[in-house]
Amino acid sequence: MSIKTIEGTLEATNLKFALVVSRFNDFIGQKLVEGAVDCIVRHGGSEENIAVYKCPGAFELPAVAKKAALTGRYDAVITLGAIIRGSTSHYDVIAAEATKGVAQAGLETMIPITFGVLTTENLEQAIERAGTKAGNKGFDAALAAIEMVNLYRQV
């Protein structure tokens, strides 16, 4: 008896994506969008199959992601943004709720919804993760979305 391993491929040809990005910390969000688009195109996707939805902040990401998933127009939804710690507990609340909300939206819709939202201690860390020293987490979130779409199709 052999164990069958099933994995998603990294092929984005003909896949349709919704990118839901927070406008708060917009400079970082735009860099994450650029990384996600780059990933999709490098893996055979086209810019014509990508829609970008901008919402006010990270707290609103789950609702817009769920609504986009429920339209049936997209194979996957990629959430992007940056939550940067400040001097109050607001960061902790927003980071927890955005993370939980995006995960819940994915479970409720059964459409792959990936989390490309940076949660950093400072702006420098966010910049590093949006395309400089630590790669681009938007690219990583798009790669996960591509793989998940192709895995879902085999389950």
Swiss-Prot record:
Entry function: Catalyzes the formation of 6,7-dimethyl-8-ribityllumazine by condensation of 5-amino-6-(D-ribitylamino)uracil with 3,4-dihydroxy-2-butanone 4-phosphate. This is the penultimate step in the biosynthesis of riboflavin.
Residues that, per the record, bind (2S)-2-hydroxy-3-oxobutyl phosphate: S87, T88, R129
Protein species of origin: Chlorobium phaeobacteroides (strain BS1)
Annotated catalysed reactions: (2S)-2-hydroxy-3-oxobutyl phosphate + 5-amino-6-(D-ribitylamino)uracil = 6,7-dimethyl-8-(1-D-ribityl)lumazine + phosphate + 2 H2O + H(+)
GO MF term (any one): 6,7-dimethyl-8-ribityllumazine synthase activity
Full protein name: 6,7-dimethyl-8-ribityllumazine synthase
Enzyme class, UniProt record, top EC level: transferase
Keyword terms: Riboflavin biosynthesis, Transferase
Protein family according to the UniProt entry: Belongs to the DMRL synthase family.
Any single Gene Ontology cellular-component annotation: riboflavin synthase complex
Enzyme Commission number, as recorded: 2.5.1.78
Superkingdom assignment: Bacteria
Binding site for 5-amino-6-(D-ribitylamino)uracil: F24, A58, F59, E60, A82, I83, I84, F115
Any single GO BP term: riboflavin biosynthetic process
